Swiss-Prot record:
Annotated protein name in UniProt: DNA ligase
Gene name in the database record: ligA
Family: Belongs to the NAD-dependent DNA ligase family. LigA subfamily.
Keywords for this protein: DNA damage, DNA repair, DNA replication, Ligase, Magnesium, Manganese, Metal-binding, NAD, Zinc
Reactions mediated catalytically: NAD(+) + (deoxyribonucleotide)n-3'-hydroxyl + 5'-phospho-(deoxyribonucleotide)m = (deoxyribonucleotide)n+m + AMP + beta-nicotinamide D-nucleotide
Amino acid sequence: MSAKSTPDAGPQEQATEAEAELRHRWQALADEVRDHQFRYYVRDAPVISDADFDKLFQQLEALEAEHPELRAPDSPTQLVGGAGFATDFTPAEHLERMLSLDDVFNVDELTAWSSRVRAEVGDDAAYLCELKVDGLALALVYRDGRLERAATRGDGRVGEDVTLNARTLDDVPERLTPSDEFPHPAVLEVRGEVFFRVADFEALNAGLVAEGKPPFANPRNSAAGSLRQKNPAVTARRPLRMVCHGIGYTEGFSPTSLHEAYGALRAWGLPVSDHTTRVQGMDAVRERIAYWGEHRHDIEHEIDGVVVKLDQIALQRRLGATSRAPRWAVAYKYPPEEAQTKLLDIRVNVGRTGRVTPFAYMEPVKVAGSTVGLATLHNASEVKRKGVLIGDTVVIRKAGDVIPEVLGPVVDLRDGTEREFVMPTHCPECGTELAPAKEGDADIRCPNSRTCPAQLRERVFHVAGRGAFDIEGLGYEAAIALLQAGVITDEGDLFTLTEDDLLRTELFTTKGGAVSANGRRLLANLGKAKAQPLWRVLVALSIRHVGPTAARALATEFGSLDAIIEASEDQLAAVEGVGPTIAAAVKEWFTVDWHCAIVEKWRAAGVRMADERDASIARTLEGLSIVVTGSLAGFSRDEAKEAIIARGGKAAGSVSKKTAYVVAGDSPGSKYDKAIDLGVPVLDEDGFRNLLENGPQAPEG
């Protein structure tokens, strides 16, 4: 029995439960942030506005600031945005880390940043004010003046090789143009942003619509999607532009300031913005921010803020960087834009766990550079809180996303024809009566999770997601086709699909009556997916609250699905990163017969239900709790964790008296400080390698 259900639980039990609930709150928020980062950086299709994402990110930062023990190396606050997501492009390692930027949203936050900077460099430092172009970050490498490679940011260390596509851009020269003043360097890594001019974006979308293809939601998505085409010929047909805004690794080029570096880039034939201004002091910085806030639509491309950088490179080096962003630069982001439109209707959508979500269906309106007609309303309570009626003129806010936010109604424009939204009492897909999952929940759900068509579609689609089995070819259209044809009854049937099954679906059948190439690829990918690790199986089961982080923790702790099923709720909750809420959801899920039937179907089809340990790797860290903080040159975040786990250790996210070692890389942060305070041994990367190989008796670096 948990402390919560014991009336006379002591302070220690209550404190333990409070800590677990706090960690669950952090984990849920971190998982939500990573989910939106995936949609933004990999799928080029965000589902919330930049402003809403910024709020989520700030909530996570605030929670970690209040409880530093929660701040793990794999927290989104410690990583560059695209970290940890696999793609179809060849990995390309940056010569020097390609960091992101910290954001500020008002003058007070800008002042706080400038105060920290001035404390180090004084009041009269020179700054560069650059327009923050809303596009896709790109790094170009020139060797002896010739373009060698182009790569996206990725996780800051490794991006995607898009060299062939980048070569099609008019703004990317194949060769640098040397001069007596600026001979080209032996090696030059230059950073920039790929974007569409507004007029070019509108023309592109018009062409797509004329061809019967879906248009892009906004210029940023179109730039990312166009540069990341598998066929460079498609990229070549789209008028992408680029502007350079920084340098990385160099040989034979040592500028003393960014201003000087930009002059050299321009001389070599690289595109540099004409709108960048060098100013003295923060008063001048604030003036430039105010100016561009009023003139943001006077230029040919969209901007969402101004980037402020220290100009002197020596001062930049003095300030250094965190694991994700330089301390010498910051992005001042303008408030998201607003518009008014007519709320034509409020409709509902049913998700894979049965959650019924209302959304606004509006007259299309141009805002922030794109046309918008839909917006989420979250739940019935939110609709009531905002006070919107069907037929209202509403204010919407958008910051370059696909689905904007409805702020509220313009009450003075009501004419009496408006009507109140009534949340349906029964599922619009299957007719089942709706109800909250538990008393007090704001969300209502369709309890017919087994056969509700909407939930089935979403679950089948979820099985193929990158965070689950990662099955290429099983998209939303395929999920619908398989279910409608009766080829599968639920996700349990996926791994027994045959060519004969696919011939029953028009989607996977050629005009000649054979299985299409896409169908054959789907079957092959389903076969490969059977060997995916246990944590992906757990995610694919659509257990409420179980995302990749909790799934990894459970798989690492128990090793097999059977062991997880047999574990008690207390044993599950004791796993770091799980907690009582997730533990209860896991136990509840496995009490449902048809849930277990899905597992047994997968098991019978050969899906891997246990992680095999490599017997050739010595268990040098058996029982040791090890925390890795900062950036390691030879290990990614996941590689360091896997190395610890494979040797019997526990890759912990926070430092305590039970921590055996803390491994500190570049910019280690508060975990390093806590280790020193607690007297926990701290290892550098060489010491970590020795520890992995030889165990605790290894010399400490």
